[in-house]
């Protein structure tokens, strides 16, 4: 509690001055042997896509599945004996929960994680598997956060904030040290922004080691709290957030992280939901890597970079995503790319019509993956049926060729998606 009180008495300028590259190097020592050094992966596909030489930093392959372990472990490892005996607490429904639980277990410290009661059971079980006591409360993160503060006050736990903490952001900054050590002539680093702790640490470390390297933050359009804060000149709050990048679904950045990002970031790029989903699909197809929505933000921003021919490190921040969610995101990305096409046609209710449609599709190399033959959907004619067909396609041009071929065969095509 003394540390929190002391920090509250300091100005933002004093906090900025009191957090340096030395803290990041100290964090690297603390993390040695605890985190994996996730080696860069050169990506010919993403390089060709954006006209730069792209290297992936796969923190989705990190212990616990994200970068969050770096900050959590660095923070908890520097608690004194009395603080560790008291135990630690936080609120999270995602990667921070697992990072804190993993770090606390490794350091023989009790951890309590407050999660919304609506948290998917797989995430709850994963957090418990690292030894944490999980408290399920409320329907939202805000409810769980309020509960964690109540328990902290009642039990005397040490709070481990997910982003607005100097030791946490110093731990996250070790990611940048690894990038620069492996790719010494890197020109730019792309880093996702949620609450801003990751971007703060990466930017601080990068600019201290090589001020010429550009550090570009990436936010989802539906949760661009840091961009809004930059535009308004102070920490600002979004009225709501809506994004598939749930790890970055933050309404308000931290005051510390706002100050660090304002000082060290060169630019913020925002990306759409479809750009995020398309990046996820490309990562799976081209690199056989799975990321969560927030993990794909850097890749989604590659086409928006204001330069060409540079060496760019894109950080894949995490890969904790459940199977049903990744399946839904892949389906939407395939539809957006014209790789899946669903349509309906009305047919006379007589033999041979389905064969006729199937022959047209076969001639156009369209692979049928779903078909529904329904008599009840036609209300204006007793002698007609509706045929709904979903096919695999090769892109938007292929879809148009299929539509034209069906129309030439006498069918009226209604595109569903």
Enumerate the language-model features and the residues they cover.
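PLP-dependent amino-acid enzyme catalytic core
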Residues: 2-417
């Amino acid at each position: 509690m003394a540390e929190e009180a002391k920090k509250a008495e300091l100005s933002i300028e004093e906090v900025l001055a009191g957090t340096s590259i030395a803290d990041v190097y100290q964090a690297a020592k603390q993390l040695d042997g605890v985190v994996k050094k996730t080696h860069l992966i050169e990506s010919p596909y993403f390089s060709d896509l954006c006209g730069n030489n792209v290297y992936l930093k796969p923190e989705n392959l990190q212990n616990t599945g994200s970068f969050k372990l770096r900050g959590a472990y660095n923070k908890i490892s520097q608690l004194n004996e009395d603080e560790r005996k008291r135990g630690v607490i936080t609120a999270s429904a995602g990667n921070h929960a697992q990072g804190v639980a993993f770090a606390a277990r490794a350091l023989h410290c009790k951890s309590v994680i407050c999660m919304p009661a609506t948290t998917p059971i797989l995430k709850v079980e994963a957090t418990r598997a690292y030894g944490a006591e999980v408290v399920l409360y409320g329907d939202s993160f805000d409810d769980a956060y309020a509960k964690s503060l109540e328990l902290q006050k009642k039990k005397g736990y040490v709070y481990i904030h997910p982003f607005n903490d100097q030791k946490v952001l110093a731990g996250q900054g070790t990611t940048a040290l690894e990038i620069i050590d492996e790719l010494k002539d890197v020109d730019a680093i792309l880093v996702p922004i949620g609450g801003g702790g990751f971007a703060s640490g990466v930017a601080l470390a990068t600019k201290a080691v090589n001020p010429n390297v550009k550090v570009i933050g990436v936010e989802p359009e539906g949760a661009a709290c840091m961009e809004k804060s930059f535009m308004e000149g102070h920490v600002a709050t979004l009225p709501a957030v809506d994004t598939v990048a749930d790890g970055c679904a933050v309404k308000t950045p931290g005051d510390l992280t706002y100050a660090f990002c304002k000082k060290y970031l060169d630019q913020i790029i925002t990306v759409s939901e479809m750009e995020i989903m398309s990046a996820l699909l490309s990562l799976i197809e081209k690199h056989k890597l799975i990321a969560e929505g927030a993990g794909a933000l850097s890749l989604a921003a590659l086409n928006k970079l204001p330069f060409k021919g540079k060496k760019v490190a894109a950080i894949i921040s995490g890969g904790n995503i459940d199977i049903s969610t990744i399946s839904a995101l892949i389906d939407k990305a395939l539809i957006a790319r014209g790789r899946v096409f669903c349509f309906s046609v009305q047919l006379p209710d007589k033999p041979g019509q389905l064969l006729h449609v199937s022959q047209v599709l076969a001639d156009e190399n369209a692979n049928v993956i779903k078909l529904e033959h329904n008599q009840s959907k036609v209300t204006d004619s007793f002698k007609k049926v509706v045929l709904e067909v979903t096919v695999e396609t090769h892109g938007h041009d292929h879809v148009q060729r299929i539509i034209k071929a069906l129309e030439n065969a006498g069918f009226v095509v209604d595109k569903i998606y």
